[in-house]
Amino acid sequence: FPSIPKDHKAREYISTNMIANFFGLGWAATPAGIKAMEELEKLEDERRKSPVLGKRGVPKGIANTEMCTFLIVNISSLQLIPINIIAYRTQYGSTNPTRIVGAAILATTVSTVVGVIFAWVMERVKKV
């Protein structure tokens, strides 16, 4: 998220959300994701008010590029340890509940990479 200032609070919430998702803790990622979106909206409000950045801002009620990219990354949810799937497999008697980890890492990596590329392409198309 290069267009978010280095010291902006949104970066902290985005990082917390991504780390929680990375470890398969979706329930812990949700509050950080909500706060990140709120902070991104505040950032967009600041851009709208700025005489220099005002042209960059999007109309109120429309998600900006950072919001869309964050949602894509959040939804694709790159995971190292799919805790919920392991728990379900254990609950239903799997003899090797962690066998899914490799496939889960591959699937979430591919979905995250494709999502980020999609967001990047859409940003470029929007600028044309």
Protein language model features and the residues they cover:
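Hydrophobic alpha-helical transmembrane segments of multi-pass integral membrane proteins
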Residues: 1-33
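Juxtamembrane and boundary regions of transmembrane helices in multi-pass small-molecule transporters
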Residues: 99-128
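The feature identifies polytopic integral membrane transport proteins across all domains of life
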Residues: 10-20, 63-73, 96-102
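Hydrophobic transmembrane alpha-helices that form the pore/transport pathway of multi-pass ion
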Residues: 25-71, 90-92
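Signal for well-folded cores of large energy- and translation-related assemblies
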Residues: 41, 93, 122-126
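Mid-bilayer segments of alpha-helical transmembrane spans in multi-pass integral membrane proteins
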Residues: 18, 23-27, 74-79, 108, ...
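Transmembrane alpha-helical segments of integral membrane proteins
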Residues: 80-93
